[in-house]
Regions:
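Preference for protein termini
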Residues: 1-180
């Protein structure tokens, strides 16, 4: 299955795109072999410029903000990838806190966080959003443009651990989606 992002572009595929799609098994194998030798970050994104005859990476982000661009049919693949990544870092994971950025100028960023949360929930994890922002002193509901809501809670320091809900939600993993 090839990931398809939502886009306004239509029409026939360019020659380069046809070649890339034809080489998908070879490309996927190369990534698989590299990931056996090198542990990749939990997640990242790469902005790619397509000149029609060559592709070039122009930016790499350790805290990706484009999960809201995934087509609905991509959620099974995204969930499978998330499960594999979680398994590497914490095989018995049950609880995860995602720490989003709260002051993004991108109006779609929080929809991205909602989709990332959905992917993590589909893996079977209990997912909550936490913040170190001094303005978040109690669970705070944020309305999104698409009608969804997110609840962000203040992170609490309990010794060397970060928890939520007066220590009742103790994650085995904290996932930053925030440049801090």
């Amino acid at each position: 299955m090839v990931p398809h992002l939502r886009t306004a572009l239509t029409g026939p595929l360019a020659e380069l795109e046809v070649k890339m799609l034809g080489a998908t098994p070879m490309i996927e194998r190369w990534f698989r072999m590299e990931w056996q030798e090198h542990t990749p970050p939990f997640y990242s994104s790469v902005d790619v410029r397509n000149a029609g005859f060559k592709l070039a990476p122009v930016d790499t982000n350790l805290f990706p903000g484009g999960f809201n661009n995934l087509a609905e049919e991509m959620f099974p693949l995204a969930t499978q990838a998330a499960m594999a990544a979680i398994e590497k870092y914490c095989s018995d994971a049950r609880n995860i806190i995602i720490v989003p950025e709260l002051h993004s100028r991108n109006p779609f960023y929080l929809q991205n966080v909602a989709q990332l949360s959905k992917i993590m929930r589909l893996t079977g994890l209990n997912v909550r959003l936490g913040s170190l922002d001094d303005d978040i002193t109690a669970p705070t509901e944020i309305a999104l443009a698409d009608g969804q809501t997110l609840t962000i809670e203040p992170l609490e320091r309990n010794g060397r651990r970060l928890t939520l809900g007066q220590g009742t939600f103790d994650p085995c993993t904290i996932l930053l989606n925030n440049d801090l």
